[in-house]
């Protein structure tokens, strides 16, 4: 049986921390679906389509990664892809507490889908999309935090005086 993972997130925008988890996950699993979720509790800077486009651009060199979007329950998306794993990145203990709730709910919805936690590399342990947007908003350099395509997209967004 092929190992198929779903790596969900809002990716607003995708950072080197996200890419670290995606790349490492692609070495562990036969197929990784990167699923851009529309989180109704967040006001995104980039549209779902823009986020998918950026993710496709920065993962095009990883043959077993496919980027898609989904609205609804993550567990339903995972089942539709015949995934047996949900791949999640952790930066700190606070991430674990949040992720534990989601994992427990997913187990109630489908006990056959496992959650696989992967710690980010230390150099990305502080990194979040929110931090990236805040730095970019005030014209700080995000070159060490995001791929070039994302940096350019952020510059374009904030040149229009759009706010995160």
UniProtKB/Swiss-Prot annotation:
Its cofactor is Mg(2+). Pathway: Cofactor biosynthesis; coenzyme A biosynthesis; CoA from (R)-pantothenate: step 4/5. It comes from Bacillus licheniformis (strain ATCC 14580 / DSM 13 / JCM 2505 / CCUG 7422 / NBRC 12200 / NCIMB 9375 / NCTC 10341 / NRRL NRS-1264 / Gibson 46). Transmembrane segments: none annotated. InterPro entries: Cyt_trans-like, PPAT, Rossmann-like_a/b/a_fold. This is Phosphopantetheine adenylyltransferase. The keyword ATP-binding applies. Its EC number is 2.7.7.3. One of its GO terms (biological process) is coenzyme A biosynthetic process. It comes from the Bacteria. One of its GO terms (molecular function) is pantetheine-phosphate adenylyltransferase activity. It is an enzyme of class 2 (transferase).
């Amino acid at each position: 049986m092929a190992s198929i993972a779903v790596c969900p997130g809002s990716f607003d925008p995708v950072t080197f921390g996200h890419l670290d988890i995606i790349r490492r996950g692609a070495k562990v699993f036969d197929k990784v679906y990167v699923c851009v979720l529309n989180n109704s509790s967040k006001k995104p800077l980039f549209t779902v389509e823009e986020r998918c486009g950026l993710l496709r651009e920065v993962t095009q060199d990883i043959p077993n990664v496919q980027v898609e979007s989904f609205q609804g329950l993550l567990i339903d998306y995972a089942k539709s892809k015949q995934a047996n794993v949900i791949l999640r990145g952790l930066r700190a203990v606070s991430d674990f507490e949040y992720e534990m709730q989601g994992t427990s709910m997913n187990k109630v919805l489908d006990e056959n889908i496992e959650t696989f936690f992967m710690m980010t590399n230390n150099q990305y342990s502080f990194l979040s999309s929110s931090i990236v947007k805040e730095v970019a908003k005030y014209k700080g350099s995000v070159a060490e935090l995001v791929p070039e395509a994302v940096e350019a997209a952020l510059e374009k967004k904030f040149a229009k005086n759009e706010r995160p």
